[in-house]
């Protein structure tokens, strides 16, 4: 292919109760930091991730204890579980046997053809997809010898090599990732991959860093990739609590209009005109709307003179003034409220609008089901 395969045209692949690919929908993924064999700790972390908005979660499976824990973990969580396997095909077989929803393994790295075939047959029997994880830092020796150093072309060649192994065994439930720590390399690799095949792509900038630096780096790289219509799932990799990865991912998707079930906050950068503690109010409102599953736009602005007009695209908002606030909807002032109660008044209106949106969505789903 010479053209980029847009995410909506990728091959649909089932992962648990989700369909990855074949639509414009992206799913947010994270990875547990716990030892997988510690079921209690792993389940507790996954439940926190679920609450934050994680839709797929990966766990490391370095040994048999981890593989054995999968069945119990699956019973206690509500999102698809992915097993991260390196080299040992027996761990992949055990993970599949114990009900894993997807396996991340590079077929070229697990040995003889019979081993690959065993994993593929087990995955086929249970409808389990395989994610091929290409990483610039661990390309095959023959590719590094050919290109001299990690390149986008080398990464695509590696992906095609692993894809061919699976396709030769008539296996096509494939997802591919093309991760690199270098932002420009990752952008180029994903773009070339989207031109080379139509399998769904999992996005990530690997080893991106700590919470602040990693957020900036991931947003820069993944934002460029998303803007090209590439990507079906994504993970923000941070050296931080994995819940922070979900928060960043949600904001990134909202920035590109790719989140149909998340609320958005609009707030001004503050200036000498403000008469309220806008920063703390904005943080409070942002936290309040973070659990909403509707596309509500909320504004918190410091200036009652320009505020409502500047945020007319917001569904609801407040603009501060001396001793009072203006509550507005779609740029039009609804009423004045005392400063000490304006946040609570805003929250009440948010709850009303969110409930209306939920009711409307439910009615549309019923209508769609009956059509």
Curated annotation (Swiss-Prot):
Annotated EC: 1.17.7.3
Residues annotated for [4Fe-4S] cluster binding in this entry: 268, 271, 303, 310
The keyword DNA repair appears for this protein: no
Protein's GO biological process: isopentenyl diphosphate biosynthetic process, methylerythritol 4-phosphate pathway; terpenoid biosynthetic process
Superkingdom classification of source: Bacteria
Keywords attached to this entry: 4Fe-4S, Iron, Iron-sulfur, Isoprene biosynthesis, Metal-binding, Oxidoreductase
GO molecular function, one term: 4 iron, 4 sulfur cluster binding
Catalytic activity: (2E)-4-hydroxy-3-methylbut-2-enyl diphosphate + oxidized [flavodoxin] + H2O + 2 H(+) = 2-C-methyl-D-erythritol 2,4-cyclic diphosphate + reduced [flavodoxin]
UniProt function note: Converts 2C-methyl-D-erythritol 2,4-cyclodiphosphate (ME-2,4cPP) into 1-hydroxy-2-methyl-2-(E)-butenyl 4-diphosphate.
Protein name: 4-hydroxy-3-methylbut-2-en-1-yl diphosphate synthase (flavodoxin)
Organism lineage string: Bacteria, Bacillati, Bacillota, Bacilli, Bacillales
Protein encoded by which gene: ispG
């Amino acid at each position: 292919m010479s053209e980029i395969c847009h995410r909506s045209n990728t091959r649909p692949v089932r992962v648990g109760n989700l369909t990855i690919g074949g639509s414009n929908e992206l799913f947010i993924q994270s990875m547990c930091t716990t030892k997988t064999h510690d079921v209690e700790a792993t389940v507790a972390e996954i439940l926190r991730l679920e609450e934050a908005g994680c839709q797929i979660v990966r766990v490391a499976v370095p040994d048999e204890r981890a593989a054995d824990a999968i069945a119990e973990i699956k019973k206690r969580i509500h999102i698809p579980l992915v097993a991260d396997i390196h080299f040992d095909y027996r761990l992949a077989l055990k993970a599949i046997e114990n009900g894993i929803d997807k396996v991340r393994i590079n077929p070229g790295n697990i040995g003889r053809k019979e081993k690959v075939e065993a994993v593929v047959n087990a995955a086929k029997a249970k409808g389990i997809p395989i994610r091929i994880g290409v990483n610039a830092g661990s390309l095959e020796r023959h590719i590094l010898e050919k290109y001299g150093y990690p390149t986008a072309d080398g990464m695509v060649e590696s992906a095609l090599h692993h894809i061919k192994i699976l396709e030769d065994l008539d296996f096509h439930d494939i997802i591919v990732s093309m991760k690199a720590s270098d932002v420009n390399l990752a952008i180029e690799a994903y773009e070339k991959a989207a031109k080379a095949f139509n399998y769904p792509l999992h996005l990530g900038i690997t080893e991106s860093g700590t919470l602040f630096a990693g957020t900036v780096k991931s947003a820069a790289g993944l934002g460029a990739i998303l803007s090209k219509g590439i990507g079906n799932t994504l993970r923000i990799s941070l050296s931080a609590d994995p819940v922070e990865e979900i928060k960043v991912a949600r904001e990134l998707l909202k920035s590109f209009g790719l989140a149909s079930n998340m609320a958005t906050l609009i707030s001004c950068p503050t200036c000498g005109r403000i008469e309220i503690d806008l920063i703390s109010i904005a943080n409070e409102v942002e936290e309040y709307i973070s659990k909403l599953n509707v596309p509500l736009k909320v504004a918190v602005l410091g200036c009652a003179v320009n505020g409502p007009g500047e945020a007319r695209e917001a569904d609801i908002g407040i603009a501060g003034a001396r001793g009072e606030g203006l509550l507005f909807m779609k740029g039009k002032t609804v009423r004045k409220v005392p400063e000490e109660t304006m946040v609570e008044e805003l929250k009440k209106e948010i709850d009303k609008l969110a409930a209306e949106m939920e009711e409307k969505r439910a009615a549309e789903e019923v209508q769609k089901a009956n059509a």
